[in-house]
């Protein structure tokens, strides 16, 4: 291939109007090389070049204008670095703020010693006016009283249930055991006497803890039901505005979306739907959008940049929609948000944190801003996201559950917590100034798996905001906030693995100075969300062991040397059934109350009353089948976190997010084996006891089957057609979700795969990636040598053998990117393996709109 042919092929790749393309073909049909074409495309500005292969840098502005002219804000987005290279202004000018964390003092004894020695540091706290104190004290007194009521109800209910449990257990002779007399008798006899009572004591303790946990959830749901049934909430944060007040022009809001190796097409589809919804309210001037990327996959990074430019072009969002990719991924998501606050936080009064799958309506966002304006003591206002958008059977069950039962628990949380509530890390508005001043997160001291950067940052940030005197509220009755759920059980468990470790880490902050009691309780409930799994497993294991002892060992009727009457093991099935029924009521009554509430307000959007109750039964069946499976996985997560083990989840790519049988048996095989052994052992030992364990053991035996079938979109869509597991967001979808689905479909059609190779070969993508790369240093011989070494290293390999780190280094430097681009085009025979690999890629040709 000669130079003229290569040049003509390059012209064909440019998104030129037909007349301009023909003129260039005529001009370069002779032997002119590619460098002359770049010079012809340049704007005449001077670019410092250390190598002839840097020549593509001069044509970057023109190539960008050809592909994304409407996305460059009339050229205002283009700037120059100190060497004259084109730099795309993807972020506004930096106005730095100081954001530093206070070191954690997790040892109360050390803190007490510092206090008596005068070394204690006062906490940074916001001073409130007398009026603000009076307004806050009103709801704080109510909240405190309500929490005492919750505590009394939970403890009273637990005490009664534990007493019943004690009377049910077969061995009732603890009072007759004399440890001093046992010292002089045979050791084996002592063990035989004590073992049943030790097992029973363990069972009783675990039962009390678990029942208390269930009871707290029951009372939370019940209060939420009453709150929603009445429909009037004097202390609702949403009641503080009428909803039509003009937004304060001095209070601007940033919508920030931290992402990391996400589905690019879905991210920017939801972002566009949110942007257009805000625009429809007429309040767009009060908002800016930031995409904050921590992605480290080069293909995804290039796809993100192109998707951002496409979005800016299509909605006219240049100068309002910004994009940044961090080089140093410090402290994960919380560090990404902190970096934004340090650089641009001073420019905004509020920020709304979005997840990669978040969609929010313009009405919801403007309402959150109005609530912040109306409540100057509110630091965080959390919306209640509604799950939607997934089609697998598993996700549809979860969507139905969160949509039907979720409002009860969210309203119940608000009832008990009021302005000392949760923050879930997304779909919430935050007051930026106090967040900068008080919510920077120091790493946890020490070594091991529970030290270092905090993983679950949201609960901690809410606790710090409240410690500083700012309110944290849940706007549980505010519509227009949406999210998506994991499509299958294994994907959910990957997320739970991170959350489990993060919540266990957070518990180290339980005794930190100044934390509000409610947020100490939040740390405790966060731990119990996962610690309840091994406790439940231990409860079942001890119950099984007690049954083994009861069946195989001869009972010890006489526990004292001169005991006149034997102690008979007893069994009171009527009390056991009553207690079992009571526990089921606590677990399932909130679900029934949720359905009653839906019926009272109209069940048409759920498929009608009959379909709603059938859906309830289907969801309850799934919850029964999946609860033991989650129990075992969460038990492994907790144990591995305490032992410092790393649990690896490397799932293969799956079509439609379906779980293949091979992965299901790999993940659930041990549970299947345990279920078979457990069931077989109990059937051999005592068939009657097997019926009590049947929901557990048969769920474990069926776990691979349930995991695979529930991950299938076909079954989920069949339920949707039958109007089962239907939610209002499907029967009458809001325009934001309809728009998200449409934009997602369009984005899929123009999806950019193999982004790194396109950044090397495609003129438009190369120009974009080059303009968004940064070269912070002026000419330096060591830097030039390093650049040349990287380029030669890459070209000496096959393209598929270039590792991720080298790809990131190449695409992050405009000079190395230009050299690679020029060499593979100007020396096609020398680098034929690169060209042939690019030509065989399955990705469609990138065509940018004129």
Swiss-Prot record:
One of the entry's Gene Ontology molecular-function terms is:
hexosyltransferase activity
Write the record's keywords in alphabetical order, separated by commas. Cell inner membrane, Cell membrane, Glycosyltransferase, Membrane, Transferase, Transmembrane, Transmembrane helix
The answer to whether UniProt assigns keyword Protease to this entry is: no
Ranges that cross the membrane: 148-165, 203-225, 521-543, 577-599, 612-634, 689-711
Topology term for the membrane: Multi-pass membrane protein
A single GO BP term for this record reads: glucan biosynthetic process
Q: Which CDD domains match?
A: Glucan_BSP_MdoH
Listed InterPro entries: Glucans_biosynth_gluTrFase_H, Glyco_trans_2-like, Glycosyltr_2/OpgH_subfam, Nucleotide-diphossugar_trans
Q: Which SUPFAM superfamilies match?
A: Nucleotide-diphospho-sugar transferases
Q: Enumerate the subcellular locations listed in this protein's record, separating them with semicolons.
A: Cell inner membrane
Q: Which domain of life is it from?
A: Bacteria
Q: What class of enzyme is it?
A: transferase
Q: Hey, which pathway is this one from?
A: Glycan metabolism; osmoregulated periplasmic glucan (OPG) biosynthesis
Q: Which family does it belong to?
A: Belongs to the glycosyltransferase 2 family. OpgH subfamily.
**In UniProt terms, what function does this protein have?**
Involved in the biosynthesis of osmoregulated periplasmic glucans (OPGs). Seems to be required for pathogenicity.
Which PANTHER family does the UniProt record give? Answer: CELLULOSE SYNTHASE CATALYTIC SUBUNIT A [UDP-FORMING], GLUCANS BIOSYNTHESIS GLUCOSYLTRANSFERASE H
The protein's name: Glucans biosynthesis glucosyltransferase H
Record organism: Dickeya dadantii (strain 3937)
């Amino acid at each position: 291939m000669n130079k003229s042919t290569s040049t003509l092929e390059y012209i064909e790749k440019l998104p030129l109007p037909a007349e301009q393309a023909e003129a260039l073909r005529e001009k370069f049909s002779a032997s002119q090389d590619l460098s002359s074409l770049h010079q012809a495309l340049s704007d005449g500005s001077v670019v410092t070049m250390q190598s002839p292969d840097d020549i593509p840098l001069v044509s970057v502005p023109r190539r960008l204008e050809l592909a994304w002219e409407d996305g460059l804000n009339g050229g205002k987005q283009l700037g120059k670095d100190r060497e004259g290279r084109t730099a795309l202004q993807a972020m506004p000018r930096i106005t730095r703020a100081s954001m530093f964390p206070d070191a954690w003092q997790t040892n109360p004894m050390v803190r007490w010693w510092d206090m008596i020695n005068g070394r204690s540091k006062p906490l940074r706290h916001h001073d409130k006016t007398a009026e603000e104190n009076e307004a806050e004290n009103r709801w704080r007194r109510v909240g405190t009283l309500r929490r005492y009521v919750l505590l009394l109800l939970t403890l009273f209910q637990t005490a009664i249930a534990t007493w019943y449990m004690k009377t049910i257990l077969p061995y009732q002779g603890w009072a007759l055991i004399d440890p001093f007399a046992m010292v002089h008798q045979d050791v084996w006899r002592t063990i035989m006497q004590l073992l049943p009572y030790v097992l029973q004591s363990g069972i009783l303790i675990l039962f009390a803890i678990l029942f208390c946990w269930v009871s707290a959830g029951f009372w939370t749901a019940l209060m939420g039901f009453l709150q929603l049934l009445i429909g009037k909430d004097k202390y609702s944060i949403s009641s503080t505005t009428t909803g039509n007040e003009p937004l304060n022009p001095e209070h601007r809001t940033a919508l920030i979306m931290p992402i990391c190796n996400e589905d690019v097409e879905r991210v920017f589809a939801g972002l566009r739907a949110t942007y257009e919804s805000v625009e429809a309210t007429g309040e767009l001037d009060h908002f800016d959008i930031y995409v904050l990327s921590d992605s480290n996959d080069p293909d995804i990074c290039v796809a993100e940049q192109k998707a951002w430019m496409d979005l800016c072009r299509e909605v006219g969002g240049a100068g309002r929609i910004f994009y940044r990719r961090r080089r140093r991924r410090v402290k994960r998501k919380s560090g990404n948000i902190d970096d934004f606050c340090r650089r641009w936080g001073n420019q905004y009064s509020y920020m709304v944190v979005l997840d990669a799958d978040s969609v929010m309506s313009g009405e919801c966002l403007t309402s959150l801003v109005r609530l912040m304006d109306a409540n100057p003591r509110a630091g965080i206002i959390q919306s209640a996201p509604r799950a939607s958008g997934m089609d697998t059977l598993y996700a549809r069950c979860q969507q139905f559950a969160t949509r039907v039962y979720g409002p009860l628990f969210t309203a119940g949380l608000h009832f008990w917590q009021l302005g000392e509530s949760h923050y879930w890390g997304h779909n919430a508005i935050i007051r930026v100034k106090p967040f900068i001043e008080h919510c920077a997160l120091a790493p946890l001291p020490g070594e091991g798996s529970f030290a270092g950067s905090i993983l679950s940052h949201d609960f901690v940030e809410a606790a710090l905001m409240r410690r500083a005197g700012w309110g944290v509220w849940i706007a549980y009755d505010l519509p227009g906030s949406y999210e998506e759920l994991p499509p299958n059980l294994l994907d959910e468990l990957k997320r739970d693995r991170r959350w489990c470790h993060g919540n266990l880490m957070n518990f180290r902050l339980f005794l930190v100075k100044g934390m509000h009691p409610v947020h100490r309780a939040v740390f405790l409930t966060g731990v119990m969300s996962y610690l309840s799994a091994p406790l439940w497993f231990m409860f079942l294991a001890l119950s099984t062991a007690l049954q083994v002892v009861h069946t195989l060992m001869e009972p010890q009727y006489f526990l004292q040397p001169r005991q006149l009457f034997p102690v008979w093991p007893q069994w009171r099935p009527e009390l056991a059934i009553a207690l079992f029924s009571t526990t089921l009521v606590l677990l399932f009554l909130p679900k029934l109350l949720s359905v009653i509430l839906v019926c009272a307000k109209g069940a048409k959007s759920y498929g009608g009353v009959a379909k709603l109750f059938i859906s309830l039964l289907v969801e309850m069946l799934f919850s029964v089948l999946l609860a033991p499976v989650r129990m075992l996985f969460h038990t492994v997560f907790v144990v591995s976190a305490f032992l410092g083990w790393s649990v690896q989840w490397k799932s293969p790519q799956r079509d439609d997010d379906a779980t293949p049988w091979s992965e299901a048996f790999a993940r659930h095989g041990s549970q299947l084996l345990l279920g078979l052994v457990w069931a077989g052992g109990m059937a051999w030992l005592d068939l009657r006891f097997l019926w009590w364990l049947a929901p557990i053991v048969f769920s474990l035996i069926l776990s691979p089957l349930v995991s695979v079938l529930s991950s299938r979109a076909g079954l989920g869509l069949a339920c949707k057609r039958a109007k089962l597991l239907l939610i209002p967001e499907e029967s009458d979808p809001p325009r934001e979700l309809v728009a998200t689905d449409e934009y997602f479909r369009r984005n899929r059609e123009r999806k950019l795969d193999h982004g790194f190779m396109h950044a090397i070969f495609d003129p438009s993508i190369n120009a974009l990636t080059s303009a968004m790369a940064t070269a912070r240093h002026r000419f330096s011989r060591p830097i030039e040598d390093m650049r040349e070494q990287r380029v030669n290293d890459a070209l000496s390999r096959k393209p598929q053998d270039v590792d991720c780190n080298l790809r990131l280094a190449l695409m992050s430097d405009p000079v190395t990117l230009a050299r690679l681009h020029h060499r593979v085009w100007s020396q096609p025979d020398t680098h034929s393996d690169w060209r042939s690999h690019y030509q065989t890629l399955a990705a469609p040709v990138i065509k940018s709109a004129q």
